Amino acid sequence: MRGKFITIEGVEGSGKTTQIQYIARYLTEKNIPHIITREPGGTALGKKIRELLLNPSYPVVPEAEILLYLADRAQHVGEKIIPHLDKGVWVISDRYFDSTLAYQGYGRGFDLTLLKSFIAFATKGLIPDLTVLIDLPPEVGLSRVKGRGEYDRLERETLEFHQRVREGFLQLARDQRFRVVDGRKKPEEIFWEIKGFLEGLNG
């Protein structure tokens, strides 16, 4: 049986990493084989691309930014995601193509139709079984990020940019594969909701 593909999305500081840790623990308890991965940086090549994308000392023009994310995703899908799904392993990814649509499409204003065609090429048309959006006002998320130390290149964008990204995610979340949770809740409460989504997939 093919594995399930689950993606976790949200603005900066939304608590994706914490929820992914909860998900991994849950799947382990249920004896469901799984891997945890991320974009960008889910492969050896992707880690190099991630360094280029998020390092503030490397100025990246918007068009190059899109193509770097797509290169990372193409490698990620071909090298890691599809092979694991084919073996019956569940794949949990911290971000996937919805982040490109939210950040580069809604955030930077690139044509969504064009982006979707690029994404379809890079992903071989692979769509998640479930996408969880942890929704959070960007000012709350950025204040959380500030507590971690230095901002990366995307985190340094304006509040207005991050507000557009959030609105983009909410527009994308109209798709039936999405489930939206309130990122202002306690982490345990958020996971209680996510656990219900996982049980629905595994039923």
From Swiss-Prot:
GO molecular function: ATP binding; dTMP kinase activity
Tree of life domain: Bacteria
GO terms under cellular component: cytosol
Keyword Heme: no
Job description of the protein: Phosphorylation of dTMP to form dTDP in both de novo and salvage pathways of dTTP synthesis.
Signal peptide residues on this chain, from the entry's feature table: none
Protein name in the entry: Thymidylate kinase
Native organism: Carboxydothermus hydrogenoformans (strain ATCC BAA-161 / DSM 6008 / Z-2901)
Family membership noted in the UniProt record: Belongs to the thymidylate kinase family.
Gene3D superfamilies for this protein: P-loop containing nucleotide triphosphate hydrolases
